[in-house]
Swiss-Prot record:
Biological classification of the source: Eukaryota, Viridiplantae, Streptophyta, Embryophyta, Tracheophyta
Gene Ontology biological process terms from the UniProt entry: mitochondrial translation
Organism: Lotus japonicus
Location within or outside the cell: Plastid, Chloroplast
Predominant location category: plastid
Name of this protein: Small ribosomal subunit protein bS16c
Database matches in InterPro entries: Ribosomal_bS16, Ribosomal_bS16_CS, Ribosomal_bS16_dom_sf
Matches recorded under Pfam families: Ribosomal_S16
SUPFAM superfamilies: Ribosomal protein S16
Induction: Transcribed and spliced in green leaves.
Keyword Ribonucleoprotein in record: yes
GO CC term, one of those recorded: chloroplast
Family per similarity comment: Belongs to the bacterial ribosomal protein bS16 family.
Length: 80
């Protein structure tokens, strides 16, 4: 099963997260299937590759709670 989850990047105390499609059995920093966006909580910036995310959701991928909250704040689920 594939999930859309956050992958931590950046420096110490300056976390930046990539939103990735990754297999459930992989660890957080494991190999991802595809990068679908990023989230910077410090600068409050979000980028979502919407066509790719929709493709993964149609194939049965499940977003984690945090990714779902970030997507709602960005207005992604309003478009559906």
């Amino acid at each position: 099963m594939v999930k859309l989850r956050l992958k931590r990047c950046g420096k110490k105390q300056r976390a930046v997260y990539r939103i990735v499609a990754i297999d459930v059995r992989s660890r957080r920093e494991g190999r991802d299937l595809r990068k679908v966006g990023f989230y910077d909580p410090i600068k409050n910036q979000t980028y979502l590759n919407i066509p790719v995310i929709l493709n993964f959701l149609e194939q049965g991928a499940q977003p984690t709670g945090t990714v779902q909250d970030i997507s709602k704040k960005a207005g992604f689920f309003m478009d559906l």
